[in-house]
Amino acid sequence: MTRQNLFPPEGMQDYLPDERWHKRRVEAQIRELFSLCGYDEIETPLLEYCDVVSGGGGRLPVEQLFKTFDRSGSVLAVRPDNTLPIARLIAGRMKDVPAPIRVSYVQDIVQYPLPKGGQMRAHTQAGIELMGEGGAQADPSRTLWNLDRALTACLEPLLKESAVSLT
């Protein structure tokens, strides 16, 4: 094993037992907050079809994705963000769920270009999505969004140490 192979690739991170425990503790607190506010946790696969996360409409160019192929030759990409895979899940498997749909997530993402500000290439992203509700009815969720921002500010030191980000 070469010296280079003793360390993870650039922008990736190993977790020692105490680091892993700390990260999981922060994630559990975030999950509990989202649940208390009426958001149900969902999970999407780490690999998505490339066209789900690439192209126009604010999606990343194909060149900025980690890509691989499945056995049938379809191009797959490691998710660089959670919003589009969650929109795919809601449009597909949750299309018959009555609105409003409130979901939360705490899952890993991997970004190809190294993010600015020393952020790791691979990290955990936590957030909420509200689908199918607008106007005055969305006000409680706007409050939650503001709480989400406040939580980010308050937990910033913990989040940096634990490689969890709120979106």
Regions found by a protein language model. Name each.
Residues 1-167:
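TRNA-recognition modules of translation machinery and tRNA-sensing kinases, especially anticodon-binding
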